[in-house]
Curated annotation (Swiss-Prot):
InterPro entries: Alpha-defensin (IPR016327), Alpha-defensin_C (IPR006081), Alpha-defensin_N (IPR002366), Beta/alpha-defensin_C (IPR006080). The gene is Defa1. Disulfide bonds join 64-92, 66-81, 71-91. One of its GO terms (biological process) is defense response to Gram-positive bacterium. This is Alpha-defensin 1. Probably contributes to the antimicrobial barrier function of the small bowel mucosa. Has antibacterial activity against attenuated mutants of S.typhimurium. SUPFAM superfamilies: Defensin-like.
């Protein structure tokens, strides 16, 4: 039952993120992105610090943010992040 509630919450969060991103599309094209309190930079790395065959050049430069209102501009949704009991959208570029 708890899994069903969690799954339902994630589905609702996905719908909310899509709705917010559609509403904010016009605003995002007019204003330049400024990191705020709601955005947190996340460094993503795969494998050893020296690099492995799994770590490609494009993955080394991946910058991700935990956003509460959906991804901006050239970012793509790559999952979710959690801060305390709140879930955020993981947006990477």
């Amino acid at each position: 039952m708890k899994k069903l509630v969690l799954l339902f919450a994630l589905v609702l969060l996905g719908f909310q993120v899509q709705a917010d991103s559609i509403q904010n599309t016009d605003e995002e094209t007019k204003t330049e992105e400024q990191p705020g309190e709601e955005d947190q930079a996340v460094s993503v790395s795969f494998g050893d610090p020296e690099g492995t065959s799994l770590q490609e050049e494009s993955l080394r430069d991946l910058v991700c943010y935990c956003r509460s209102r959906g991804c901006k501009g050239r970012e793509r949704m790559n999952g979710t992040c959690r801060k305390g009991h709140l879930l955020y959208t993981l947006c990477c570029r």
